[in-house]
Amino acid sequence: MQMFANPEVALAGLPGCTVGIEAEEGLLATLESLAKSIGCVPLPLPAGIRPLYHASAYYVGPFLIALLKEGAKLWAGFGASERQSMAALIPLLRGTVAAVQDAGLAKGMGGCIARGDMGTIQKHLASLEHVDSSAADLYRKLALRNIPLALERGSIDPGRARQIETLLDSTDKPVR
C-alpha cells in the first residue's frame, strides 16, 4: 500500500509495499509475479474485499494526515506555524511507528491512556474543550479506541479501563 500524492515519492517507496490482488486463479500467479518483480509484496484478496482493503489504508494514510492537521491546528493556537508543528510532530510519528514495529500495537503504545493517567486525560479534555469542542470530541473517540490496547498491553486493569471510559463518555465538560 502506498500514498500516491507525489508519483516520484510513491515510486521510491514502492519496494516492500503490499499490493492487494483480487484475481481469478489463472491471472493471480501472473499478477503476484509482477508485484514481486517491482519489489512489492503480493497479497491475494478474496473476491469483493477490495473496498475494505482500501478503507483500511485510509486509516493510516489520508486519515493520518487529517490527524496531523488537527495537531497543527492546536499548535497554531499557541502561535506555532504549521512548519514548526510538523517539525515536532513528524519525529513523534516516526518514533510511534518504530515503537509499533519493535513491540506491536499494544506494547508499542505509550501515553496517558496506556498509563491509566486520569489526571492527564482530564487536563487534555479541559484544554481541548477550551479551544475547540470538536477536537475534544475527536480526542474522546480516539481515546476510547486506545483502551482495549492498554488492556492488552497490561498497563491498566479492567477497573481503570471503566473509569477512563466513564470520563471519556461523560457529556459534562471537565472542570477547568
Name each model-derived stretch:
Residues P42, G48-V131, A135:
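Helical "substrate-binding/catalytic lid" subdomain
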Residues G20-E22, I65-L68, S155-R162:
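A general structural signal for short secondary-structure boundary/capping elements
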Residues M1-H54:
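Rossmann-fold dinucleotide-binding core
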Residues L31, G71, N146:
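Aromatic/hydrophobic pocket-lining residues that form π-stacking "cages" and hydrophobic walls in ligand
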Residues L105-R176:
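C-terminal active-site/capping subdomain that shapes the small-molecule cofactor and substrate pocket
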